[in-house]
Amino acid sequence: MLDAFAKVVAQADARGEFLSNTQIDALLAIVSEGNKRLDVVNKITNNASAIVTNAARALFAEQPQLISPGGNAYTSRRMAACLRDMEIVLRYVSYAMIAGDASVLDDRCLNGLRETYQALGTPGASVAVAIQKMKDAALALVNDTTGTPAGDCASLVAEIATYFDRAAAAVA
């Protein structure tokens, strides 16, 4: 995983050049939105348990067969594994958000996840629905500006939405 700064430096170094004005401007934009990015990650981190729990409840209300005998989330052990996996995805989405880059999400969470779920018989479509529900909850939190400094966070909202969409597509 390389953050935006490391990527820019690595690219310039590979070419044996100084950073261009365009690259410097891009890095300045990242710095200027840094506090907003931290606010987004803090909201998700501070509400992670509720995001995961409420998404799971909504999923199981829509798909009760998952928690019925023989379902993929039936028994407390399987339910715990489901909640753990949802929390891991949410955590890596927050890592991608703070880094401003999806590679940490891809490399450490999503690569091979679909194949793992297929091997375990876990319905990827249901996991994708759970991720969508976490996305909806996270976006509602991020869009709630109560108690946070005013500022346009539309680009960050769109960015975090893409990380959730990427995760859902990876398992579907």
UniProtKB/Swiss-Prot annotation:
Light-harvesting photosynthetic tetrapyrrole chromophore-protein from the phycobiliprotein complex (phycobilisome, PBS). Phycocyanin is the major phycobiliprotein in the PBS rod. Contains one covalently linked phycocyanobilin chromophore and one covalently linked phycoerythrobilin chromophore. The modification N4-methylasparagine is found at N72. It is a peripheral membrane protein. Keywords: Antenna complex, Bile pigment, Chloroplast, Chromophore, Electron transport, Membrane, Methylation, Photosynthesis, Phycobilisome, Plastid, Thylakoid, Transport. It is found in: Plastid, Chloroplast thylakoid membrane. This is R-phycocyanin beta chain. NCBIfam families: phycocy_beta.
